[in-house]
Amino acid sequence: MEGGVAEADVSAFRECLSLSWKNPFVLRLALSAGIGGFLFGYDTGVISGALLYIRDDFKEVDTKTWLQEAIVSMALAGAIIGAAVGGWINDRFGRKKSIVVADTLFFIGSIVMASAMNPATLIVGRVFVGLGVGMASMASPLYISEASPTRVRGALVSLNGLLITGGQFLSYLINLAFTTVPGTWRWMLGVAAVPALTQVILMALLPESPRWLFRKGREEEAKEILRKIYPPEHVEDEINALKESVEMEVREAAGSDKVSIMKLLKTKTVRRGLYAGMGLQIFQQFVGINTVMYYSPTIVQLAGFASNRVALLLSLITAGLNAFGSILSIYFIDKTGRRKLVLLSLCGVVVSLVVLTVVFHETTTHSPMVSTIETSHFNNTCPGYTRATNPSQWDCMTCLKASPECGFCASRANKLLPGACLISNERTEEECNKEEREWYSRGCPSKYGWLALIGLALYIIFFSPGMGTVPWVVNSEIYPLRYRGICGGIASTSNWVSNLIVAQSFLSLTQAIGTSSTFMIFIFITVAAIIFVIIFVPETKGLPIEQVENMLQTRSLNFKFWQTSPQSAQVPDQKHQSV
């Protein structure tokens, strides 16, 4: 009924496609609002490629790891604020106006970034974009949910998620398209202004959410919109259902004025639900997904691929697999169950992280040696190499670690043969490239680089259908109805904060302890996540909220995660009940 988000399955998506001729108004509404999800994905994905060229234009960014992390992570800081403020704006001014405000922030941020003359201005633009991301992450799915027919609501809300991953994939394509255009990263970051402006125009032609209008006492406007959304024979039933649902919400809100965090934690079902919901959101980030999404081209370069363009091209694999995994999750999440799917996902993530750890260990311990003859061929030797007491023992990694000012020019005959350790600047890079040599300033030439690509691909293949989707689904099912808003907000905030911590620390960790050791940390965290899921996360597939509450109240360990839970088995026919 009205107010709940029905689960999306394959049949719902087939019916969703039929809207293109049955009710194009609903599809136009969902796609127009879904541009917010697309912008969310684009602006979080585009920085991974743009960062490669920002480093080339701003020397201080190239030499200061914390500045690179700040450019990436300040959008996340903005998103935390945007999500917090967005909830109030959604309720006070409506879903439609919230989306337009988010678009305005996207537009301003894109223009500021595209015209930035220094890193500080670039960071300001990233904060603006982050504010838009935070608001869009709440407003777009909420608008789609409240203005969609019940039977296809789950599919249309899932469409927003697909547009997020689609936006990330397109950002990699656009990054690749602008690699040979003067201004490179300015175009990459500025392009987001176009869909933002497009959405403002489209939203001006669409109505407000009927649920919000009902809550504000504007019932006639809401009824008029519902007549456009539903077939004539269903309109009156939906109007009555919406009215009852809103009245119930108002009553529950009136009884929830004095809810505090301490009161929540004293309630066993809520406390255990928060353990599961928050834990899944935190582990989703701490197993390293956004190091792959934000720094994928950089990771590819660390694996031994020198060219920015090649790094972007190879990173398309991860973005494409992420989008594909989101589609797969629609099928597997109901066939497999939440708990089993997330455990299988995490086990696969462990395997892929082991591959990455081994590959980067081999890459760093078997890098090409530095040749005195090759180095003396150029006139700008790295000062550290000149002062070294044992230059004959230097290899490529020693050269790169000696100073951010040093780089490695590979041998022309074979990049795995001894090369030159030189001062890293544009002139040196040009001289190196003129002699048909490859220039390395991030990673070193390696015969194992292609294995790193396999590791990244495996990571996304295992992560996306399970850990990419399940935390959000479980958080929509596990809390008592009265506390769902506040608990969902707490869990969502924990996700953004964890995301910020990982994004702000990844490059610093790789510099301090090495890339292989950094991925090893993610292995330990993922193993901890597996143990956490076994102990704290129940199976919520197909359970009504009353059954979920009872299960949390009497929770006991079930190590046989591959078996269907007793509660789930008891209610197979209740799968589509509102939770």
Residue spans for each PLM region:
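Alpha-helical transmembrane bundle of multi-pass membrane proteins
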Residues: M1-Y230, E247-V579
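Short, well-structured alpha-helical segments
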Residues: V235-E247
